[in-house]
Amino acid sequence: MQHLAVIMDGNGRWAKKHHLPRLAGHRAGAESLDRTMHWCKEAGIKYLTVYAFSTENWKRSKGEVAGLMKLLSHFIKSKEKELVKNGVRFRVIGRREDLSEKLQGEIAALEEKTKDGEFTLVVALSYGGRDEIIRAAKIFNAEARNRPLRGFATRGEANTPSEASAERRREHGESVEDEAVFSSCLDTAGIPDPDLIVRTSGELRISNFLLWQAAYAEFYFTDVLWPDFDKTEFDKAIASFSKRERRMGGRLK
């Protein structure tokens, strides 16, 4: 496995369980992320994507949203040296324009300083899978208008499909090339699709997370709240994945 994605759910319930304010749960969740990143590196996993803040989360109270943004800013400032030292590349996906200019600047600076890291931490922030697909479709369509149709002659040549193009269409229906081009328009361009998606807290849904990229991902659901996600639970998720036969839409021979 090279890419693990996590829906970090249960911070609020963890805080309530321990009679603490919700932001205390988010701080505990940040500590759990630190540990999980370390375990991923130990396991040889190259990419960790975490669902930190969705486009729907803006509907939460102003106090909680402000606290979450402050927590993220603190994470960026306090973890910079550690991420660089440990070879961790930091990357954010989502609607950056929704964030404050200050936070956008901090994110861009950390991405630049960690760009050579061999392990990649992807943080989904003000992110929604449907929104990402819509934005990608607009880019895809704009680029399509500026490039000739594949397999058709241009600039006065005969307007008939080439033999090679016709063969491609017969074998693949053009979907392989189209999918690759469309994928390059997504926020996750250059990042492999997740092999395993883990969701904590007992919820059995993906909540608008990586909808395009999750097409062939395996899923692991656990009742454990995110701040309580420990090495034992991490190992269970990895072990569950290792026992599965991934067909990727085809049949095993």
Where are these regions (language model features)?
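Flexible, compositionally biased loop and terminal segments
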Residues: 1-150, 163, 168, 173-253
